[in-house]
């Protein structure tokens, strides 16, 4: 995009994925792609309209689109693996890969856990009812989320 170097600059969003010499990232509201860090060659890119970072594993990259669709792409070539429409228009956070789940928070303080395999709903956790304001993080064996009202919630598997 653009005709000169300045116009071609794009904002990359935090929340990237790295496996050996491959780094994958999302460009603000434009695309997702992977680059070989040794050669600098672009391995693949695909359109992806989102404003949060991505997460990944050896099989898939996960991201939230601007409209709330949660998507998975094949890490190897960017082909679409699955899309979940069930959380549309909920102002989702960026994703976290945790165990067998992709975890996102929403504007109502709910934490959603989707299957990494197919995007099916696995679980939903409640907080204080205010928006989750940052991408969930894992601290050891604890899932941690922060809400707009200042709540810090930790969830541990039983």
Which residue ranges define each predicted feature?
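Structural signature of WD-repeat beta-propellers
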Residues: 27-28, 65-66, 106-107, 147-148
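Extracytoplasmic beta-rich repeat domains
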Residues: 1-20, 43-58, 81-98, 121-140
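Short loop/turn segments that connect beta-strands within beta-propeller blades
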Residues: 36-39, 74-77, 115-119, 157-158
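C-terminal hydrophobic structural anchor segments
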Residues: 92-116
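Short, low-complexity, Pro/Ser/Thr/Gly-rich segments in the mature regions of secreted, periplasmic
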Residues: 147-157
